[in-house]
Amino acid sequence: MKQMVFMLVTLLLGTAGSFALSPVYGLSIYYLYAVLRPQFIWEHHEFAGMAIGDMQWSLYVALATLAATFLWRAGLFAPSKVSAPPWYGNPPFTRSHYLFMAFTAWISLTFPTAVSTDRAWPFFVEYVKIFTMFICATFILRTIRDLWTVYFVVLGGAVYVGYEINTYYLNGGWLLLASRGYGGLDNNGAALIVAMAVPMCYFAWEASSGWWRWLFLLAIPPLLHAVLLSYSRGAMASLGLTAFVIFLRARNKKFLGVCYLIGFVLVLIMAGPEIRERFFSIGKADVDESFQSRQNTWAIAIRMANERPLFGLGIRNSNLFTYDYGADIPGRSIHSQYLQTAADSGWVALLLYGLFLGSLFVGLYRSRRILRPYTDPESLKVQSIASGVECAMVLFCIGAFALSLEHFEMPYIMMVLAVQLNAITRAVATRLAPPAAAPSQPAMPGTFRPGIVAS
């Protein structure tokens, strides 16, 4: 019953809250559902004859959020918490916004040009959902407080996923992800959700104050254990490599170094012989059939993209032909986010995707550079959210080399947070910049007050 109560309360907050308070609440609940996937984990829970798995919770929240955003930005209706714009104005569209729009347009073009539109249709629908909510989010997220709201809600969902994975294992020895996947994601996709939550937890701890901040650190060991239980070598390796970036971005490096030592010991304790064997087989490419299969599909993807460089074979059409190109079994996926994009939608799509990711990281760098001279608490919090989002994205980008996750919503959530963070910091910097001085007068230095960003 408690699961149904949770769903009804969040549904009310996401729908009515979008109109009464702010569309930020609807967006946050929509993204919570995207990460939590309640129809999967609670599919058999019901109350008064109504099962959680029978309702389209995300659809109701999405429609309410889109409607409230349209009415608000069209000037027809203003929810109470967004009746006035921020003091620095609405964040402008940046290069990253336009690159994402270009990527969206090109991916959409590869649906009507697909070899099989029937095959492409369900995956195209998933793209439309992701793109629509991403674009909607760029109009909704206007303050740092908005970004933190989404950040914490999504992080809570990811931590709960880790809790469920651990609960299934501890109560019955069942490896949920390895046996069943997670709500349409295979073990690799679900493991990345949990792995991306690790740097998010650390930088949430760094940004917070009070005793409850330690709950973020306490959540990390169960998350690590959940990643191990996934048997996803891609997620394990991505998290290990991202640890270096987390260390570079951390403010208290000595404390983090101690945490790394403790974490290393915990991983050795938590990882059984099967997990250790699974992880260390990454380096045994000559005997690892999985790695050899990936190498083969990568070569196939390059051939496909070279033959159809503009539009590719069509969204998710490459799986239909990998066997004809020499894959070991029919329907074999490419197992690389980047090469899958090239095979399905052409080299142009991959170029736009790469440019967008590059612009995103440049934007995060510029945001940190603006804030670097300032040590007030609000500026440090903004630096923390930038670091948390950046490290989560680095982890995804590493994992995407060997995993095919083009409809994976978690990175798109991080992307929109990164894009809007850069837009907000640019808007603040522009507003606080001193006016241009007359030619005969020296320009007076301006005082940047980044702490105001949080309002």
Task: List each language-model region with its residue ranges.
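Transmembrane signal-anchor hairpin modules in multi-pass inner-membrane enzymes, especially those
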Residues: 1-108, 118, 122, 142-152, ...
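Membrane-interface micro-motifs in multi-pass membrane enzymes
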Residues: 2, 51-60, 122-123, 182-195, ...
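Alpha-helical transmembrane segments of multi-pass inner-membrane proteins
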Residues: 10-19, 64-69, 100-112, 128-136, ...
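Membrane helix-loop boundary segments at the extracytoplasmic
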Residues: 32-42, 342-345, 379-422
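A membrane-periplasm/extracellular boundary helix in multi-pass inner-membrane enzymes
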Residues: 70-75, 163, 225-230, 247-289, ...
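Membrane-interface catalytic loops of GT-C/OST-like multi-pass glycosylation enzymes that act
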Residues: 118, 122, 231-234, 332-336, ...
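Long extracytoplasmic/lumenal interhelical loops at the membrane interface
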Residues: 175-176, 181-183, 273-275, 283-345, ...
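Hydrophobic transmembrane alpha-helices and their immediate junctions
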Residues: 255, 260, 345-394, 417, ...
